[in-house]
Amino acid sequence: MDNSTQKDQHSGKKYSRKANKVQKGFTAAYPTQSSIPYKYQPLIIPESEKKGFNSQAKRFYHKQDDIPGPGFYNVIHQSPVFDSVSLSKKGTCTFPSMCARLDTIVSKFPAANAYTIPSRLVSKKDFSNSCSSMFQLPSYEKVLKFETPAPNQYNASDSCCKQANNVCARAGFVSKTQRGLFTVSKTGPAPGHYDVNESLVKQSPKILMSCFKSKTDRGLKLTSTGPGPGYYNPNGHPKVQKKTLIPRNPILNFSAQPLPLPPKPPLPGPGQYEIVDYTGPRKHFISSASFVSNTRRWTAGPSQPGMPGPATYRPEFPGKQSFLYNEDNKWIPVL
């Protein structure tokens, strides 16, 4: 009795443990089978078959329903560093590198919240609320103020330009011409609307003339005292005038004294001579044989009566004729 009761109690404890404790599956892309029964029975594929040739792609996945199970989305892949026994720790290439892969990067600088900025370094004016600092004046530069007045902020006085006393040195010959603005009378005539009296020089013409008129005479030709064109020959020799020699002792002659030769006529001026064409008429170049024939060309023979003239008839060459039947159904041989 005691043994049976102890077995029952012991067996009851075992049953109670299995009944009260619920197995929790691994929450990943491929959830394991849970202890709670449900409608669909999934197929369990071992993990060794899913890993093939260092690939992390999903293989041998069989989906039974359209409803995603727990852990079906937000998949977290495994680490690229494999700890499998089948893979070499030194790599799979020909010359593996001994350097460690995927080292943890440790920053050499402190984090943003690891230090505090002193208050004296913080700018009193925050430019981030308005515009960028590159479009504003620098805060550390002092703006220079102009101490001189503007062009319209003072009245110029003429007292500094005038002479203050008579003690200072002055020039010996001081000009008495007044300086300043030239007052133009409004009633005077405009330039060119009055005549200048030039009666002292010459009589002024009654036309509109300029106020500043030149007194140089225009249109006057000076009489030349030298010879004109063609009056002398620059290539000739100067002429020596021959005087008539009258003998002092006259001799009894039966003839008069010889007279000198008449002078040569002057050279002709422009337009007094005719231009002679010494080149002759222009030659007409015609083709001729080396031995020119004396036979007459274009000789028209005597016309014979009854002969037709040129272009009175039109000779025609007989064409090829066929052996087909004509209108008379006769054979026509080829000539």
Curated annotation (Swiss-Prot):
The keyword Nucleus belongs to this UniProt entry's keyword annotation: yes
GO biological process terms held by the UniProt record: positive regulation of apoptotic process; positive regulation of mitochondrial membrane permeability involved in apoptotic process
Record Pfam families: SHIPPO-rpt (PF07004)
UniProt entry tagged with the keyword Phosphoprotein: yes
Entry keyword set: Apoptosis, Cytoplasm, Nucleus, Phosphoprotein, Repeat
Known function: May positively contribute to the induction of apoptosis triggered by O(6)-methylguanine.
Biased amino acid composition, Basic and acidic residues: 1-11
Protein name: O(6)-methylguanine-induced apoptosis 2
Species per Swiss-Prot/TrEMBL record: Bos taurus
GO cellular component: mitochondrion; nucleus
InterPro entries on file: SHIPPO-rpt
Modified residue annotations for Phosphotyrosine: Y73
STPGR repeat start-end pairs: 68-75, 110-118, 149-156, 188-215, 226-255, 267-284, 308-317
Family: Belongs to the STPG1 family.
Region feature Disordered, mapped onto this chain: 1-20
Compartment(s) where it occurs, according to its Swiss-Prot or TrEMBL record: Cytoplasm; Nucleus
